[in-house]
From Swiss-Prot:
UniProt KW keywords: Cell inner membrane, Cell membrane, Hydrolase, Membrane, Metal-binding, Metalloprotease, Protease, Transmembrane, Transmembrane helix, Zinc
GO annotation terms (biological process): proteolysis
InterPro entries found in the cross-reference section: HtpX_protease, Pept_M48_protease_HtpX, Peptidase_M48
Tagged with keyword NADP: no
Superkingdom per UniProt: Bacteria
Active site feature: E148
Names of the cofactor(s): Zn(2+)
Gene symbol of the encoding locus: htpX
This protein's name: Protease HtpX
Record family assignment: Belongs to the peptidase M48B family.
Transmembrane segments: 4-24, 41-61, 158-178, 199-219
Amino acid sequence: MMRILLFVATNLAVVLVASITLSLFGFNGFMAANGVDLNLSSLLVFCAVFGFAGSLVSLFISKWMAKMTTGTQIISQPRTRHEQWLLQTVEELSREAGIKMPEVGIFPAYEANAFATGWNRNDALVAVSQGLLERFSPDEVRAVLAHEIGHVANGDMVTLALVQGVVNTFVMFFARIIGNFVDKVIFKNEEGQGIAYYVATIVAELILGILASMIVMWFSRRREFRADEAGAQLAGTAAMIGALQRLRVEQGLPVHMPDTMKAFGINGGLKHGLAGLLMSHPPLEERIEALRRRG
């Protein structure tokens, strides 16, 4: 909770600085001179409320959504020795990472994958696919679990949601400024908000949204390196490299995890060219090389 409060306070400060900066550069005067009566401070607050609301709601219901969309079955009472081993391994890794034991589950998917989610590091969910349990060795599964525990210990779910809230705020803010500019300055509309405002705002939100997604995915790729490092500390560098190499062997298999969950899995799929800027995970080769350099 302290992380959320600190991050929100920081971003309110960013919003305030942005508003003051625009005023100092005479943006308010320029817009007013062209017939645009726009209170930038109020607009920023409005956008911040709605920008953060969506990402924070998603964060607080993330465990429920993950269970629903992936079909994850929570292990409350282990029925097999594999489930017993899974619970014991997660408990051991959680203790080493200094976090409370998360819920543990298995989701029905052939591809080898796993994810962690939850609104804070002491109320999380870690789940692995059936395919991962069936085809990976115990050491490889343990390394994958260590990677996911690393995400939880680092508070990555919270931070990613808050970063998303920040970019949502500025996408909404600048899209509405662009919409007002097009409507009032270019089309000279003097009565309320014309059709040009709505069209320009929608187009601007689409374009700025793509750019914002690149920023969020850049951050997501950075956190994967950090989770790999945490996994190496908990399970050993050799085991973490071995798990990533095994994932690389299976890279041709389609990833059936819902789009909303791919950023939280260990295997985010593969994209090429400009689409690579929208990847939630770095290429496995880069992750393996980073661990080798780490030693």
